């Protein structure tokens, strides 16, 4: 599996990328980064969360509103509605990534970001778009990572390390500046400091798992080779 992932990474790293590919890569980073989410101008359309939108609310008693999932659900039926709620963001993100790939953006990501992500996390640069997406949306990044794994562009080891990065503080920007607003007035430091701490420990957590995997691979060389 490792040899297959390295072979694919090598092909992407040596394949020539035109200006169109680099432009697609940078535009996709901007799209998933959330930099335009707070503006009221027309360029809000270049933000993932804006295009993803939101479901309407159903009117209830006494002026209250609920989502289409309703309230008090349980079991498989409520789980089905929850999964249905996640579908639009996953479909949209995978569609954007397919367009980016068709324009050569993933090859550009591999060539530009591998020298950065390999030392930091031990994963190839092709993961960079999912890494950026994870800052704003949990499901989009997970879907993109699954697609990379299924296409053999990342190894099982890469997937495990990357999942550790994503699980810790997932959708940090969206959650921090929505739910976190309630405690901003009580912070004894700058608003950006807790955000930076969370981001740093996303990398710390992934590297702790990375060290553990290295230890296990040295202890069981045959098992590490199969991964």
From Swiss-Prot:
InterPro entries cross-referenced by the UniProt entry: Gate_dom (IPR011642)
Cellular compartments annotated: Cell membrane
One Gene Ontology cellular component annotation held by this UniProt entry: plasma membrane
UniProt KW keywords: Cell membrane, Membrane, Transmembrane, Transmembrane helix
Topology of this chain in the membrane: Multi-pass membrane protein
Transmembrane feature ranges: 17-37, 79-99, 112-132, 181-201
Protein's name in the database: Uncharacterized protein YjiH
Provenance organism: Escherichia coli (strain K12)
UniProt gene name: yjiH
